[in-house]
């Protein structure tokens, strides 16, 4: 579950690299059920979900690559989905960008005036999405006026000791607190801090063994302990309503 309930007070901006962000959102959705991957049209499955200290937000089923390794490394998982929130204004602008062809990633030829003031032109090739990135607000500059908070977590249903249980572990991060500490907004903070902790685990030899491994294949306890110490405290809810069948 990935909710950004913040407001950067821009008409349209992405919280990280626009090329990656827009391509990620406009690709087909993908989720896992009973050993099979199910593909959906982009953002076609959505429902309101309630996030701690935020309330209900429309949440959209998307493809996120961590699902692919989780179901491989935890073969007892029967179903896995990733949900992310988007505001209606963001989606309206995104539709406009797509309809105008500005989300294209193929090269187009453009007749551009020369910078020497001669009035002459030259044919150049540009990628529309890369051009769009150049004119959109820089994600690094959003933090100063960003308010609100993020809420990121996992909602899990299964059996423990023969009983049906639910479990919700989550972190909320306020954009202004992240900015005051690092000069960056909360989305960057919640991305960078876990990566830093992972590097720490590796450098200290806590997460180190021959071969190539995913994060979920290591002992989670020292990682979770560091999240609490490094500015991303987490909370647990046992046997609550997950709002998802």
Sequence positions of predicted segments:
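C-terminal catalytic/substrate-binding lobe primarily of soluble NAD(P)-dependent oxidoreductases
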Residues: 1-245
């Amino acid at each position: 579950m990935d909710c950004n309930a913040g407001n950067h007070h821009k008409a349209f901006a992405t919280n990280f690299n626009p090329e990656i962000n827009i391509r990620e959102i406009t690709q087909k959705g993908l989720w896992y059920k009973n050993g099979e991957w199910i593909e959906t049209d982009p953002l076609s499955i959505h429902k309101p979900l309630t996030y701690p200290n935020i309330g209900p937000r429309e949440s959209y089923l998307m493809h996120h690559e961590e699902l692919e390794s989780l179901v491989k490394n935890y073969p007892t998982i029967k179903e896995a989905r990733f949900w992310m929130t988007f505001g209606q204004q963001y989606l309206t602008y995104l539709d406009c960008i797509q309809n105008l062809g500005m989300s294209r990633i193929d090269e187009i030829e453009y007749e551009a005036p020369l910078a020497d003031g001669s009035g002459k032109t030259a044919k150049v090739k540009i990628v529309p999405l890369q051009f769009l990135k150049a004119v959109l607000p820089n994600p690094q500059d959003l933090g100063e006026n960003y308010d609100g908070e993020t809420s990121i977590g996992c909602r899990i249903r299964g059996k423990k000791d023969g009983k049906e249980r639910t479990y919700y572990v989550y972190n909320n991060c306020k954009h202004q607190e992240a900015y005051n500490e690092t000069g960056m907004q909360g989305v960057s903070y919640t991305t960078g801090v876990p990566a830093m902790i992972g590097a720490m685990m590796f450098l200290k030899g806590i997460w180190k063994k021959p071969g190539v491994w995913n994060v979920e294949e290591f002992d989670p306890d020292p990682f979770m302990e560091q999240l609490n110490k490094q500015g991303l405290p987490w909370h647990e809810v046992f046997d609550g309503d997950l709002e998802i069948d």
